[in-house]
A protein has these predicted regions:
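Helix-to-loop junctions at the C-terminal end of transmembrane segments
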Residues: 1, 105-118, 202-203
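Transmembrane alpha-helix termini and helix-breaking/packing motifs in multi-pass membrane transporters
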Residues: 1-10, 193-207
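Helix-loop junctions at membrane interfaces in 12-TM secondary transporters
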Residues: 5-7, 137-148
Length: 235
């Protein structure tokens, strides 16, 4: 942004280069071994297969969907940065900072999740996201904005992949593909609704209301997790 004087068109043309190299690598450099088809392929998304999924799995789907409603697109972090009178070329650094914190915290929290209840870790992640939402809602300076962005990155490091692990632990091995497909379907719908709702709140009531709404949904998710049968919380 700084080198091209905020010329978005030039920046996107430069971004085409790694995208083209990735496609070339997939097309000409990656060779997959041929595996013989030993049985007839069938559609696994059937009512009888869904009935085989445990109640613990469906609890994870419900909790994950509600949680996703609070995790609207990170584009709203960029929009918040624009309101702080940050120079245009520096605004992408918000996403850089968030992803840097995320990458630095993902491994240690992933290691920690191996030795503690996944539901407990998810609850701690929700608390961090609540803190991030409140800081971002109240921020009026770039320093508090960065604090909120850092908290958002920490919550990503704590929770990203955690729900996937919970799906894997609660679904039978032969139906894990179906379980992940249904979970991703519900999460995708929730993310679409979350981002659309966040946009409406932003336009009608202001930026702060968007982040406050995210915090409220996190609280609802925590309440839902407290209502989860204790046997399911030990995954």
């Amino acid at each position: 942004m700084f080198l091209w004087d905020n010329d978005f068109q030039s920046i996107f043309w430069v971004a085409v280069i790694p995208a083209a190299l990735s496609i070339a690598l997939l097309g000409f450099g990656l060779k997959e071994p041929k595996t013989p088809i030993t049985r007839k392929r069938t559609n696994p998304l059937r009512r009888e297969n869904l009935k085989k999924l445990s109640a613990a799995y469906w609890w994870v789907v419900v909790i994950g969907s509600i949680f996703t409603l609070a995790r609207f697109s990170e584009a709203f972090l960029v929009l918040r940065a624009q309101q702080m009178a940050i120079p245009l070329f520096a605004i992408p650094l918000v996403m850089v900072a968030m992803n840097l914190v995320y990458s630095l915290t993902a491994y240690p929290f992933g290691k920690l999740s191996d030795s503690m209840s996944h539901s407990k870790m998810l609850q701690w992640g929700l608390l961090v996201l609540i803190a991030a939402d409140i800081v971002l809602a109240l921020s009026s300076h770039w320093s508090t904005l960065l604090a909120g962005v850092a908290l958002w990155g920490i919550h990503m490091g704590m929770t990203q992949g955690l729900l996937a692990a919970m799906v894997a632990h609660t679904a039978p091995p032969e139906l894990r593909g179906t379980a992940f497909g249904m979970f991703n379907l519900m999460s995708g719908v929730a993310l679409l609704l979350a981002s659309a709702g966040a946009g409406v709140l932003w336009e009608v009531f202001g930026a702060a209301s968007t982040f406050y709404a995210g915090a409220v949904i996190c609280v609802l998710t925590l309440i839902g997790m407290r209502c989860m049968p204790s046997a399911y919380q030990q995954n």
